[in-house]
Design a protein with these regions (language model features):
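Flexible, glycine/charged-enriched surface loops at secondary-structure junctions
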Residues: 73-77, 93-95, 260-269
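Internal, active-site/partner-interface "lid" segment
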Residues: 224-228, 258-281
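N-terminal export leaders
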Residues: 20-33
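Acidic, Ser/Thr-rich low-complexity intrinsically disordered segments
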Residues: 275-299
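N-terminal secretory signal peptides
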Residues: 1-18, 36
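A short, well-structured juxtamembrane/interface segment
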Residues: 69-84
């Protein structure tokens, strides 16, 4: 698509025409607003490219906003995590509710990632193993903390796309009780839009960032899905997974950099699909296997 192409009205603003350059300069929030009144006409003969272009523009703008607006808190969190890791502590990560576990998985036992990450994936609290109610019942947090051996002085990265999931808030409250430092990653503006009376909120009516020592915003827009299709009432195509994974990878990148700058020697996984991977990964795996629950035996 070249810069002279226009967007034509589709979502209730018939006749709207916006230059692509104007769209690109609008930032994430402006782009979202524009998309409600216009869609890209696309390159002639390239059927189906309109929504791909819209989606990429919004995601890229949001990523830039994360780097700009969350920089201070990401660096503050990385400073804390790098100290913990250099002291020999594990970095605990829990993705609470639905698909939020994906972001926790993104930094656990992952190529280019730290070996000292303790991924917490209890049965019943994510989309793969949850029953109809288990992820929405209060009272699981103490058992999760004990099972994964999260102790006073440790740090927990608590990920919940929107920040109001019942299990997530339960985990945040338990962290405060146990003297565990809490880093949260969630969509803070999204959480504010959800009424306190919403039936799937925690009884405390809190969001996880209300309890955080360091709160990082993943800049997920409300209501997560962002694209419009003419003739369809619902928005389509979510943003939460890609933006949250980007955010947590920014955090871990800075953590590893700071570990090295402070004189540490971070142990980094390499891909299990490249030559000599076993020679590199097996000694690291052997070191952490009895401390990290989900490092199951592979050799």
């Amino acid at each position: 698509m070249n810069t002279s192409e226009k967007k034509t009205g589709s979502c209730g603003k018939s006749g709207t025409s916006l230059d692509r350059r104007e769209f690109m300069k609008a930032g994430a929030s402006g782009a979202l607003a524009m998309m409600c009144g216009a869609s890209f006409a696309g390159t002639p003969g390239a059927a189906g490219t309109d929504l791909m272009t819209q989606y990429s523009e919004v995601i890229i703008d949001a990523m830039r906003d994360i780097v700009k607006d969350e920089r201070a808190n990401i660096l503050k969190a990385a400073d804390l995590l790098s100290d913990n890791a250099n002291e020999g502590r594990l970095i605990h990560v829990y993705g609470a509710g639905g698909h939020s576990a994906i972001a926790a998985m993104e930094i656990f036992w992952r190529a280019g990632g730290l070996a000292c990450v303790n991924g917490m994936f209890p049965v019943g609290t994510n989309v793969m193993t949850a029953g109809p109610t288990t992820a929405k019942v209060e009272g699981f947090a103490p058992y999760i903390f004990s099972f994964y051996d999260v102790n006073k002085g440790d740090t927990l990265i608590l990920v919940n796309f929107y920040g109001l999931n019942i299990t997530a808030v339960d985990m945040a409250l338990e962290a405060k009780k146990r003297g565990v430092k809490l880093i949260t990653i969630n969509a803070q503006k999204f959480a504010k839009k959800v009424p306190k009376s919403f039936k799937w909120r925690h009884s405390s009516k809190l969001d996880i960032n209300d309890l955080a020592d360091i709160a990082i915003d993943n800049h997920v827009p409300y209501p997560d899905a962002i694209l419009k299709v003419k003739g369809l009432k619902e928005e389509i195509t979510p943003t939460a997974t890609i933006l949250t994974c980007f955010t947590i990878n920014c955090l871990m990148s800075e953590t590893i950099r700071m570990m090295v700058e402070k004189g540490g020697k971070p142990e980094i996984w390499v891909s299990n699909n490249i030559p000599n991977c076993d020679e590199h990964n097996k000694p690291i795996h052997d070191k952490y296997r009895h401390r990290v629950h989900h490092l199951y035996p592979v050799w």
